[in-house]
UniProtKB/Swiss-Prot annotation:
The lineage of its organism: Eukaryota, Fungi, Dikarya, Ascomycota, Saccharomycotina. Belongs to the RRG9 family. The keyword Glycoprotein does not apply. Keywords: Mitochondrion, Transit peptide. It is found in: Mitochondrion. One of its GO terms (cellular component) is mitochondrion. Residues 1-20 form a transit peptide. Required for respiratory activity and maintenance and expression of the mitochondrial genome. It holds the Pfam family Neugrin. It comes from the Eukaryota. This is Required for respiratory growth protein 9, mitochondrial. It comes from Kluyveromyces lactis (strain ATCC 8585 / CBS 2359 / DSM 70799 / NBRC 1267 / NRRL Y-1140 / WM37).
Length: 242
């Protein structure tokens, strides 16, 4: 059949012309040729594109740069700020996984959400200055919509209680030095980072001054700083009166 087509049609015709002439169907993707036909035939079969070739082409276009060597997203003023931030972060991390050095606790994350609800005009940069973290950390916290259920909250409280009991046992067994018999356990709400200059609210634990007849030096030679400071202030007052 193919030899008959070769006699009727010129050898310069392409595969598309054969299909258009009705000799070959359009849906065929392969030809079965004899050895003589492979030698004598000048018909070139179009190469079928490989799988994933289009995806690689799209990635190449996305990674294309202009003549100055800068990425195209830098000069594209139509991009929104969040997308520019995403491109900048991807370029900064060099394709690595997001893993910040400083991580906020669960309470500090709730503080970030509380700040955004109470002060909607504050941007991610403003909150980041308060918490001493990068704006990307604040953006990811505000973007997350996950909230623990009641069962998860109970599990969190149970794990924290178990952890505090374990630490208390370490103190009592003498495995941790400096145990004084009382471990102040207080919960505090801090709106701002631990080293932030502007702290909106902080609840400090109350200091246990102990009995009034407490000695300056106890059996373990521990110095009572509060009593020493009070004694020095008393001497200064007496000198002023004299």
């Amino acid at each position: 059949m193919f030899k008959l087509c070769g006699w009727l049609l010129p050898r310069s015709r392409t595969l598309f012309e054969l299909r258009k002439a009705g000799v070959m169907p359009f849906h065929s993707t392969a030809l079965t040729l004899s050895e003589n036909d492979k030698i004598d035939s000048s018909i070139k079969v179009a190469e079928i594109p490989k799988k994933g070739k289009a995806k690689r082409l799209i990635n190449t276009v996305n990674r294309s740069k202009d003549n100055d060597g800068h990425s195209t997203w830098r000069d594209n003023t139509a991009l929104p700020d969040w997308k520019r931030q995403k491109f900048a972060l991807k370029e900064k991390l060099n394709g690595e996984r997001w893993n910040p050095k400083k991580k906020l606790s669960r309470e500090q994350m709730e503080t970030v959400r509380l700040l955004k609800r109470q002060f909607p005009h504050m941007t991610s940069g403003d909150i980041a200055i308060q918490m001493k973290v990068s704006p990307e950390v604040v953006r990811r916290i505000l973007k997350s919509k996950w909230e623990p259920t009641e069962e998860e909250l109970e599990d969190i409280q149970r794990r924290w209680k178990k952890r505090s009991d374990r630490i208390l046992d370490l103190y009592e067994n003498g495995k941790i030095d400096g145990y004084t018999g009382i471990i102040p356990v207080t919960r505090k709400v801090v709106i701002g980072g631990p080293n932030s200059e502007h702290i909106i609210h902080r609840k400090k634990p109350q200091q246990d001054l102990g009995p009034s007849n407490k000695l300056h030096y106890n059996k373990s030679k521990h110095i009572d700083r509060g009593a020493v400071k009070a004694r020095n202030n008393l001497h200064l007052l007496l000198k002023k009166k004299i």
